UniProtKB/Swiss-Prot annotation:
Organism of derivation: Variola virus (isolate Human/India/Ind3/1967) (VARV)
Record's function text: Plays an essential role in viral DNA replication. Binds to ssDNA with high affinity and localizes to cytoplasmic factories where nascent viral genomes accumulate. May disrupt loops, hairpins and other secondary structures present on ssDNA to reduce and eliminate pausing of viral DNA polymerase at specific sites during elongation.
Source taxonomy: Viruses, Varidnaviria, Bamfordvirae, Nucleocytoviricota, Pokkesviricetes
Record protein name field: Protein OPG079
Name of encoding gene: OPG079
Other noteworthy facts: This protein is synthesized in the early as well as at the intermediate time of infection.
Superkingdom of the organism of origin: Viruses
Length: 269
């Protein structure tokens, strides 16, 4: 086991928001803006369309002409403290795992998507009739929970293991779920795509599907050393072998039961 010591590790202050402010339309938009490193215009407009499910509206994004001409996708990139959990109550279903991302940075696509969706609802345009009764002032917004985005649509996603100076390893996430769920929380990047706008009474949220997870191949733990300084300690002896044998992983019962949450979960759409 190797270790690299970095003394007095300092990170830039992370934007924070109160739970109450993240549950308002204006608050969630402002928070998404605060974690965006750019304000470049990406989205021309968004249309919400009725779907076969009464509580769900499909999301259609029209990018700016300059981005459309470059065949740019509508995927959204996030970065943050990431952890894959087993969902105790749903092991027999396809959503037996879900990803929790405590977002520290996001593409401007995220705040512009939220801004466009709630702008549509406010002005009663580009939305299905089922949403006309909604008032942005009374909505309880649930896209973020504890400054995190939860994603349980993982089917078809890829995971890319990266390491400085070495070729990355790209794999289907289906075969990596068990080993990833045993890792500690790690800084990672995620590429996601919006799926539906979900409404339950006055509670609303945008749900996402994972397209790609980009994560360090090496499992590293931050510990406080004997001198009181922060140390980054590698928990893997050989990264290549560990990927195959699932060594260097935290062997704990790190499962999360959505049904134990006192709040009504609406991120399972």
């Amino acid at each position: 086991m190797s270790k690299v010591i970095k003394k007095r590790v300092e990170t830039s202050p992370r934007p924070t928001a109160s739970s109450d402010s993240l549950q308002t339309c204006a608050g969630v938009i402002e928070y998404a803006k605060s974690i965006s490193k750019s304000n470049a215009k990406c989205i021309e407009y968004v249309t919400l369309n009725a779907s076969q499910y009464a509580n769900c509206s499909s999301i259609s994004i029209k990018l700016t002409d300059s981005l459309s001409s470059q065949m740019t996708s509508t995927f959204i990139m996030l970065e943050g403290e990431t952890k894959l959990y087993k969902n105790k109550s749903k092991q027999d279903r396809s959503d037996g795992y879900f990803l929790k991302i405590k977002v520290t940075a996001a593409s401007p696509m995220l705040y512009q998507l939220l801004e466009a969706v709630y702008g549509n609802i406010k002005h009663k345009e580009r939305i299905p009739n089922s949403l006309h009764s909604l008032l942005v002032e009374t909505i309880t917004e649930k896209t973020f929970k504890d400054e995190s985005i939860f994603i349980n649509k993982l089917n078809g996603a890829m995971v890319e293991y990266v390491s400085t100076g070495e070729l990355s390893i790209l794999r289907s996430i289906e075969g990596e779920l068990e080993s990833l769920s045993k890792r500690e929380r790690q800084l990672a990047k995620a590429i996601i795509t919006p799926v539906v706008f979900y409404r339950s009474g006055t509670e609303t949220k945008i749900t996402f599907a994972l397209k790609k997870l980009i994560i360090d191949r090496e499992v590293v733990a931050n510990v406080i050393g004997l001198s009181g300084d922060s140390e980054r300690v590698s928990m893997t002896e050989n990264v290549e072998e560990d990927l195959a044998r699932n060594l260097g992983l935290v062997d704990i019962d790190d499962e999360y039961d959505e049904d134990s949450d006192k709040e009504k979960p609406i991120f399972n759409v």
